[in-house]
Amino acid sequence: MRLTKQLIFGFICLLFPLTAIKAQQHNRFVKPFIGTDGTGHTFPGPSMPFGMVQPGPDNRDYGWNHTSGYQFQDTFLMGFSQTRFSGTGINEMGDVLLLPINPKKEQGKNSYDKTSESAKVGYYSVTKNDGVKVELTCTQRVAFHQYTFPENVAQVLVDLQHGLRFVFDPNDAKALVIESSVKIENDHTISGYCSTDNWVK
């Protein structure tokens, strides 16, 4: 009986040599914009399994179609927040909104052309109408932003009061941020925190 099992195993190994097995790149089939239209409640930004951050674009901070902060049909941009729920159908998080702007072009700082937007596994980019290119990626615990400005002048707006509100009327203001602080460390570093109160405590 033992010899029979060894022969069967040997025959199977001959049929499927281990050297012929190659790793496949299945991430080429992933389309991050699926579910970002209508009531799909997803966003196209990068994320990691069980990650602490999900950086991405925020078009609006309230309403049923914007529970992840993003809606594919929109071309208005509030900025790029660092956390969100994707696919749950509930507005939540949207913490620490950043908006890079070109101060020489006031028009276009909050809008973009859909043809400039792209996403793939672990990466999102868009070029705003003021010429600023935004690229996002992340690790398990850190969101990385890279901004490319068309001129020698660059500004980044930091909004610690922003959050994805679980309301359907923009006039139904609900305070999400309990406490916040931001400190400019140097020309390349800011630090801070915000403590929020919403569905997730």
Could you say what each language-model-derived stretch is?
Residues M1-Q24:
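Bacterial Sec-dependent N-terminal signal peptides
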